[in-house]
């Protein structure tokens, strides 16, 4: 099954995976306390605005994760004191689904004292608080559903397992978590760009 890009949001940990048929030459890099999806050196040049973006960023003491440029305004709104749910809803509504050939949904999640997952599609906006690991993807599973991946344990293993989930066309994955006491713990991220 082809899910496209997907997130799994848990209470203290989140996963992001890029799966792609159109732009497989991408990787996740760490820079300036963010995780960013960028083309690899082998990638053909493109002016497609949906190929490179921050997929993880800290907002206040929360972790914001998503499949595009909406990650930045969500984190910025949280930094300004917005409640997590409102920051997620406002940014998704403002930026809407991607205006590509597939009307690709935007997906995002927030990990913190209250964790949320959201999606904006051409036909719906869904924002949910979560209490168990929850998956939402750009294709097929485009409504929040219980994830089939445990988010407990070693963060490096979680990133690799996310990459290895049996969904088609994996490109790269990352996992991020709060280590320590709840939201006040350090944020630790792990990238897995394939073998």
From Swiss-Prot:
Entry EC no(s): 3.5.4.10
Gene Ontology biological-process entries: 'de novo' IMP biosynthetic process
Record InterPro entries: IMP_cyclohydrolase, IMP_cyclohydrolase-like, IMP_cyclohydrolase-like_sf
Secretion signal span: none
Pathway(s) served: Purine metabolism; IMP biosynthesis via de novo pathway; IMP from 5-formamido-1-(5-phospho-D-ribosyl)imidazole-4-carboxamide: step 1/1
Cystine crosslinks: none
Pfam family for this entry, one: IMP_cyclohyd
HAMAP family to which the protein is assigned, alphabetical: IMP_cyclohydrol
Known role: Catalyzes the cyclization of 5-formylamidoimidazole-4-carboxamide ribonucleotide to IMP.
Recorded family membership: Belongs to the archaeal IMP cyclohydrolase family.
The name this protein goes by in its record: IMP cyclohydrolase
